[in-house]
Amino acid sequence: MNKKEVIEAVAKVFADKISELKSSLEGTRDRARDAPGHNVSHSDTSRFQLSNLALGIEKQVVEYEEILKQIKGVALEPADKISVGSLFTLCDTDSDEEKNFLMLYQGGGEKITVDGVEITTLSITAPIAQACLGKETDDEVKYRNNTFEVTEIL
């Protein structure tokens, strides 16, 4: 795995999400501006509801922009221990199935494929991320009823 390529791919995912949200935000604002307000009809709250929706989208944009900044700031040098910014592989000791992760402060749950390898982003607050923090290559990670071995840290 090439850590730089993975970081670039994850950054693209979040940049694309930001672009989609901004487009959605623009459309929502337009609809809110054109919607009837409560002055037109006592039972119509479309403008209010659309305005609230726009505020929610704005918050998501800000969150994703913060995540994107953090992703772009991830160190490319390999670390000895798993920490925020680590790209690492866990191998299930029972099934020998390997899973690849990129640990971030925020933005967990995204699955991307780089050169045919699936990588899942982990938020540092995720229980499995907490179990992995500070582990080194060949260490065991116990999560739920499974045991994993750390096989690679980049």
Each language-model region and where it sits:
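Mixed-charge, polar/low-complexity N-terminal
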Residues: 1, 7, 29, 36, ...
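Helix-rich terminal scaffold detector
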Residues: 1-65
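Generic preference for flexible, low-structure residues
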Residues: 30, 37, 41-44, 73, ...
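Generic hydrophobic-segment detector
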Residues: 47-48, 75, 128
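Long amphipathic N-terminal alpha/beta scaffold segment
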Residues: 55, 59-97
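Non-DNA-binding regulatory cores of transcription-related proteins
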Residues: 80-142, 148
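Conserved hydrophobic positions within beta-strands
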Residues: 150-154
